[in-house]
Curated annotation (Swiss-Prot):
SUPFAM superfamilies: Nucleotidylyl transferase (SSF52374)
Recorded GO MF terms: ATP binding; tryptophan-tRNA ligase activity
Record protein name field: Tryptophan--tRNA ligase
Gene Ontology CC terms: cytoplasm
Family named by the database record: Belongs to the class-I aminoacyl-tRNA synthetase family.
Length: 384
C-alpha cells in the first residue's frame, strides 16, 4: 500500500480507510449501528450508508441511545466558502438532510467566510462573502427544512464570538498546535479560529452530531477535550470517505484542479466534456482485450461515482460491476451512462438552486430556528 496523507487541508495518495480509523482513533460504522439507524427511523438506509461511504464515527452509538431515550440530539455541519461547490462538497449535505428528515432534529450550518479569509492568502473578505452567498444557494437546494435549519455566516452572526471567548480560554497553544500544526508563521486569527468552529456544538444542551468527511475530524478533537468541563456533551461525528476526482482514485476531488471536478453550476456540455476526456476507467488497452480479459471496476472512477451517489439501485450497480468484469461492458458505455446521470442530477439541482434565491432570508433570519438563535441569549456556561 502506498503512503497516503490526510489532514484538514490536504489529502494525498490512495487512502487506506481501515488504517485511517486506527490513526485517528475513531470507530468503524458497524452493521449493528446501521441496523439500529434503520430500526429507529423506520426507513431504508440511503446508499451513502448502505455502501459504506460513511464508514467511521465517534460516539454515534451514544447519539442513537440519546434519541431512543427521548433526550434527542442536533446536527451541525458547515461550508468554507472559498469558491464554487462541486459534487464532492454536496454529497455529505444529502446525508445530513436524510438524518434531519428521518430523526426530525434541528440542523445548524456554519458558513465560515472569516476562516477562509484568514487561511487563504489570495482571497479577500469580499471574495469569501460573495462565495458564501453562492454556496448557500447550493446548500438550500438540497432540500432542508427551513424551520429546523439555521444557516449562519460567521461575519454576520457575531454572537458566535461571544460564545468562542470562553472556549478559547480552554485551549492553550500547545493543544492547538498539536492538532493543527500551527507554526510561527501562522496568522494569529488562524490560531483563534478553532474556538469559533467549536462554538456551534454548544448551541443546544444535547449531544451534537457532525456528518463530515474524515479529514475534518481534527477540528472536533479539541472540543471533546473540554466540552464536559463546560457542562456539555462531547460532540459526536460520522465520517465519510472522499469523492475522488475524475483523473484517479487517489486524493479527493479538488476545486484547485478544475479538470478533476464537476461543479454544481456546470452546464450539460461541460459535464460531458469533462467526464469523456478526463474520467479514469478500469478498462484495458483495447476493446478486444477488454472483451477477453474483462475490465477492472475497482480501479475505475466512473464506477466509483456510480457507487457513491449516481446509481441508487443496488441490483443495477452489481449487474454493471459483473458485466464489466466479464468483458460485456466497455468504458465508453459506462461513461455515457454516468454523463447522463450527472446531467440529470445537475439539471434538477440547478432548478432548485434558482428557487433557493427566494429562501435565503428564511434559512438565515426568519425561519423558526433562525429567529430562535438570533433572539437567544448566550448560555451561562459560555459566559466565562
Amino acid at each position: 500500500m502506498d503512503e497516503f496523507k490526510v489532514t484538514p487541508w490536504d489529502v494525498e495518495g490512495l487512502v487506506d480507510y481501515n488504517k485511517l480509523i486506527e490513526e485517528f482513533g475513531t470507530s468503524p460504522l458497524t452493521d449493528e449501528l446501521l441496523e439500529k439507524t434503520a430500526q429507529l427511523t423506520k426507513s431504508e438506509l440511503p446508499l451513502y450508508f448502505r455502501r459504506r461511504f460513511f464508514f467511521s464515527h465517534r460516539d454515534y452509538d451514544k447519539v442513537l441511545q440519546d434519541y431512543e431515550s427521548g433526550k434527542g440530539f442536533f446536527l451541525y455541519t458547515g461550508r468554507g466558502p472559498s469558491g464554487p461547490m462541486h459534487i464532492g462538497h454536496i454529497i455529505p449535505f444529502f446525508a445530513t438532510k436524510w438524518l434531519q428528515e428521518k430523526f426530525g432534529v434541528n440542523l445548524y450550518i456554519q458558513i465560515t467566510d472569516d476562516e477562509k479569509f484568514l487561511f487563504k492568502d489570495k482571497l479577500t473578505f469580499e471574495d469569501t462573502k460573495y462565495w458564501a452567498y453562492q454556496n448557500i444557494l447550493d446548500i438550500i437546494a438540497v432540500g432542508f427544512d427551513p424551520d429546523r435549519t439555521f444557516i449562519f455566516q460567521d461575519s454576520e452572526f457575531t454572537k458566535i464570538y461571544e460564545m468562542a471567548i470562553p472556549i478559547a480560554k480552554k485551549i492553550n497553544f500547545s493543544m492547538a498546535k498539536a492538532v493543527f500544526g500551527f507554526t510561527e508563521q501562522s496568522k494569529i486569527g488562524m490560531i483563534f479560529y478553532p474556538a469559533i468552529q467549536a462554538a456551534p456544538t454548544f448551541f443546544e444542551k444535547k449531544r451534537c452530531l457532525i456528518p463530515a468527511a474524515i479529514d475534518q475530524d481534527p477540528y472536533w478533537r479539541l472540543q471533546r477535550d473540554f466540552a464536559e468541563s463546560l457542562g456539555y456533551y462531547k460532540t459526536a461525528a460520522i465520517h465519510s470517505k472522499f469523492v475522488p476526482g475524475l483523473m484517479g482514485l487517489e486524493g479527493k476531488m479538488s476545486a484547485s484542479k478544475p479538470e478533476t471536478a464537476i461543479y454544481l453550476t456546470d452546464d450539460p456540455e461541460e459535464v460531458g466534456r469533462k467526464i469523456w476526456k478526463y474520467a479514469l476507467t478500469g478498462g484495458r488497452a483495447t476493446a478486444k482485450e477488454q472483451r477477453e480479459k474483462g475490465g477492472e471496476p475497482e480501479k475505475c472512477v466512473v464506477f466509483k461515482w456510480l457507487e457513491i451517489f449516481f446509481e441508487e439501485d443496488d441490483k443495477k450497480l452489481m449487474e454493471r460491476y459483473h458485466a464489466c468484469k466479464n468483458g460485456e461492458l466497455l468504458c465508453g458505455q459506462c461513461k455515457r451512462y454516468l454523463i447522463k446521470k450527472v446531467q440529470e442530477f445537475l439539471k434538477e439541482h440547478q432548478k432548485k438552486r434558482k428557487e433557493a434565491e427566494k429562501k435565503v432570508e428564511k434559512f438565515k433570519y426568519t425561519g423558526e430556528l433562525a429567529r430562535e438563535q438570533w433572539d437567544k441569549a448566550v448560555p451561562e456556561a459560555l459566559k466565562g
